[in-house]
């Protein structure tokens, strides 16, 4: 008799996705971040659900409802800080996952990659709205600055911003709708994740060599289930160290001051995971130009397949492009640092140079290096 997991309509899908799935025998720990992102999403949805049970999305009570969660709700402080720091862990895993895809040429799975780019935008939108909900100073002014960027759109900009605000400034209507969107988006993300995996399972996983691995597959369970569990344990350890010992290290102290439209904080800046994009936005003196650069800084991921010039898939055997890749990583760290600095000399210049470098490396240098490597290896025909 065949096992029920291979026959049952629902269990069969789970079986073919997580148990009997043929996986390459040589995928490294860089392939762990997909499952870690799944765990992050589950943690965020569960902690978020429990927070939503006690949170009120009205400007007069939002700040005090978060205080109430931390002080009066059983383990409310734990749920709140797991949710806040869980977002940071989510983005760390997201950046590493995307970086892995860039390094090993996973973007050649076009459908999977494009859904992934949409997921990056969806997760960023969710996080941006989540940071508004506690209704502290940085919540209010962050929401004001970010929504105001849309006013740079010619002709319809101002109308669009006021439509999103639900009035002439960030106020009650804005907070309520941001809570609604922040609640619904993770479920849309979950649906997109299913589509992401659906497309991935059409082709099978990439692997560090970049070669076809059909000749050497192993079952996902037990080999990669146990490997994923190790990754999950490490992720939870890091998350709990953050939550229990340094819960506010990644937050902004200004957000412990209730929102006040009459008092602007000295330095308005987003959460750390948006700082690189914020630095690119600020590096262009023109408002519309900055917004375009901001969007392109993420959207550029979508054109990576078009910029691939090498005859090889990944960077495993390509030292020149490898060097450029790690310079790009260092450049992103510089942008992140600049995004958190005030707009003054020398930070303005450093930010502009780092922004130019970011686009130059991806659009010009890496494709050129790919062609050079083809010639060096005589892969010319």
Swiss-Prot record:
The chain crosses the membrane at residues 33-53, 77-98, 113-133, 178-198, 226-246, 288-308, 320-340, 347-367. Its cofactor is heme b. The keyword Transmembrane applies. Heme b b566 binds at residues 97, 196. GO terms for molecular function: metal ion binding; ubiquinol-cytochrome-c reductase activity. Heme b b562 binds at residues 83, 182. PANTHER family: CYTOCHROME B (PTHR19271:SF16). The cytochrome bc1 complex contains 11 subunits: 3 respiratory subunits (MT-CYB, CYC1 and UQCRFS1), 2 core proteins (UQCRC1 and UQCRC2) and 6 low-molecular weight proteins (UQCRH/QCR6, UQCRB/QCR7, UQCRQ/QCR8, UQCR10/QCR9, UQCR11/QCR10 and a cleavage product of UQCRFS1). This cytochrome bc1 complex then forms a dimer. This is Cytochrome b.
């Amino acid at each position: 008799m065949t096992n029920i997991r291979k026959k049952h309509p629902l269990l069969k899908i789970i079986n073919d996705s997580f148990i009997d799935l043929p996986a390459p025998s040589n995928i490294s720990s860089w392939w762990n971040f997909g499952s870690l992102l799944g765990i992050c999403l589950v943690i965020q949805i569960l902690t978020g659900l429990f927070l939503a049970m006690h949170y009120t999305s009205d400007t007069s009570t939002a700040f005090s409802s978060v205080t109430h969660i931390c002080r009066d709700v059983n383990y409310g402080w734990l749920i709140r800080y797991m949710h806040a720091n869980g977002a940071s862990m989510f983005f760390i895993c997201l950046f590493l996952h995307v970086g892995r895809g860039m390094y090993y040429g996973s973007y050649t799975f076009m459908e999977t990659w494009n859904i992934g780019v949409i997921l990056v935008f969806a997760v960023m939108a969710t996080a941006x709205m989540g940071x508004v909900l506690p209704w502290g100073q940085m919540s209010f002014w962050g929401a004001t600055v970010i929504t105001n960027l849309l006013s740079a759109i010619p002709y319809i900009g101002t109308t669009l911003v006021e439509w999103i605000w639900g009035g002439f400034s960030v106020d009650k209507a804005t907070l309520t709708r941001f809570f609604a969107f922040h609640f619904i988006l993770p479920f849309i993300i979950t649906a997109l994740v299913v589509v992401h995996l659906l497309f991935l399972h059409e082709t099978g996983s990439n692997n560090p060599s970049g070669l076809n691995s059909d000749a050497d597959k192993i079952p996902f369970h037990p080999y990669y289930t146990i490997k994923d569990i190790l990754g999950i344990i490490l992720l939870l350890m890091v998350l709990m160290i953050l939550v229990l010992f340094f819960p506010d290290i990644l937050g902004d102290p200004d957000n412990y001051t209730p929102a006040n439209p009459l008092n602007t904080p000295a330095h308005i800046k987003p959460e750390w995971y948006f700082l690189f994009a914020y630095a690119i936005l600020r590096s262009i003196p023109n408002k519309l130009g900055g917004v375009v650069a901001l969007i392109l800084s993420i959207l550029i991921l979508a054109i990576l397949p078009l910029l691939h010039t090498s005859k090889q898939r990944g960077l495993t055997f390509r030292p020149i492009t490898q060097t450029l890749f790690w310079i790009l990583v260092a450049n992103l760290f510089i942008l992140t640092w600049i995004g958190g600095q005030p707009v003054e000399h020398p930070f303005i210049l450093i930010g502009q140079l780092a922004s130019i470098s970011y686009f130059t490396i991806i659009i010009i240098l890496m494709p050129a290096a790919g062609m050079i490597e083809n010639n060096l290896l005589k892969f010319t025909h």
